[in-house]
């Protein structure tokens, strides 16, 4: 371990954010750190990035950085949480658009699951960051998964009602179809790497859901 790693670890153990209600200025500074950290992680990778790198990119001192985040892991989780929040907002907007069930779900998948991942993967350290999310932010990933599944469930249920389809009479529920779709998308991401093939596979999964309520 390098001297810098020893110093960062010692500092991380002794440093804690101020225990008080956050102000609007605090929120703005936190967001500035999150934006800066994303740039740093994409440029250097998580392992090589330091708190000094993040503080410098955020245009603040290292002590000021520690007023808002305990350590690098805390910042990584904040970055992941912010990205998941944006992804959920985009999913909600896509599903609220006019169009068929398939068009709306495919739009959400394109925007949130394919395009976003491609943007991250296009960086030199994207693969490292995507791998780390499962070890450093597994609870956030699970929360995002459940939230998207719930959005898909509600969208499918609303479409079935509009069509006058009783899913229970077919041995199905909107929740089951939504989870099947999410599981299929997760498996697709593991075996298909390029975006065009992912879109094709995703559309086939959505088509299965559409046929279930036709």
What are these regions (language model features)?
Residues 26, 34, 80, 84, ...:
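Amphipathic, non-transmembrane alpha-helical scaffold segments
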Residues 32, 36, 40-74, 78:
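Helix-turn-helix
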Residues 43-47, 98, 119, 163:
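Short coil/turn segments at alpha/beta junctions that flank glycine-rich nucleotide-binding fingerprints
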């Amino acid at each position: 371990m390098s001297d810098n790693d020893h110093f960062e670890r010692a500092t991380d153990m002794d440093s804690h954010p101020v225990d008080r209600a956050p102000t609007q200025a605090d929120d703005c500074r936190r967001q500035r750190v999150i934006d800066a950290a994303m740039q740093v992680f994409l440029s250097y990778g998580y392992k090589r990035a330091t708190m000094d790198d993040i503080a410098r990119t955020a245009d603040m001192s290292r002590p000021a950085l520690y007023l808002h985040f305990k350590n690098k892991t805390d910042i990584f989780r904040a970055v992941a949480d912010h990205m998941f929040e944006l992804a959920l907002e985009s999913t909600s907007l896509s599903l609220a658009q006019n169009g068929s069930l398939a068009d709306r779900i495919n739009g959400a998948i394109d925007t949130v699951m394919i395009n976003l991942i491609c943007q991250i993967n296009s960086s030199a350290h994207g693969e490292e960051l995507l791998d780390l999310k499962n070890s450093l932010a597994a609870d956030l990933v699970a929360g995002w998964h459940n939230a998207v599944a719930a959005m898909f469930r509600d969208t499918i249920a609303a479409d079935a009602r509009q069509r006058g389809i009783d899913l229970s009479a077919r041995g199905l529920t909107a929740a089951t179809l939504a989870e099947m779709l999410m599981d299929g998308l997760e498996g697709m991401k593991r075996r298909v790497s390029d975006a065009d093939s992912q879109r094709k596979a995703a559309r086939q999964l959505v088509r299965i859901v559409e046929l279930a309520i036709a």
